């Protein structure tokens, strides 16, 4: 069982199970989807550590109970209006981004790691938050990953950046359309960001082994120091 760790005001399972080194040198902070919690993604830790024995996985629970599932959590409210006017969620996303960044800073302090050793990723709503943090946040992570997510709002062009993104999506996603990630890729690249895009044929709203492999490869490249 992974241990539960609290950083800032967020808590969730922390996975680091290896006999090869004493403590992690890199961390993937992975944000769950709407109505789930951190335990939903913690099982990915073992697969990631087969690829990168020095990486830990921290899966914090969202800061608020899910409005449609009180047993789950959410990063921001996802009402029916969201699908017509997603930009209306931006003020709450900004507030949540501050909470996530404070947690990541506390994590780095505790593990004595620089932000360049951290990748922030997420699935579905968590992926939306990861893309938001990468384009509007202040915590300078090594990279940002969105799995079956979407980019909310306008991206400000950047003149020079080393920040990279991993964007993956199943072509048969019935919850968040595949086109959302294709649009995110286009908007990010137009703004000047580096994007690794992975389309997963016939995959619905989920994470398969190929996506996990792609995420692991991205984490490895992004955190090369």
Residue ranges and their predicted role:
Residues 5-113:
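Serine-hydrolase catalytic machinery in alpha/beta-hydrolase-like enzymes
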Residues 36-37, 65-66, 152, 174, ...:
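Active-site loop signature of alpha/beta-hydrolase-fold enzymes
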Residues 55, 118, 165, 195:
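Hydrophobic anchor at the start of a short beta-strand
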Residues 60-61, 121, 145-148, 168, ...:
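Alpha/beta-hydrolase-fold catalytic nucleophile elbow
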Residues 108, 116-162:
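Primarily recognizes the serine-hydrolase "nucleophile elbow" in alpha/beta-hydrolase
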Residues 166-169, 173:
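Short beta-strand/loop motif that positions the catalytic acidic residue
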Residues 179-225:
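C-terminal catalytic histidine-bearing segment of alpha/beta-hydrolase fold enzymes
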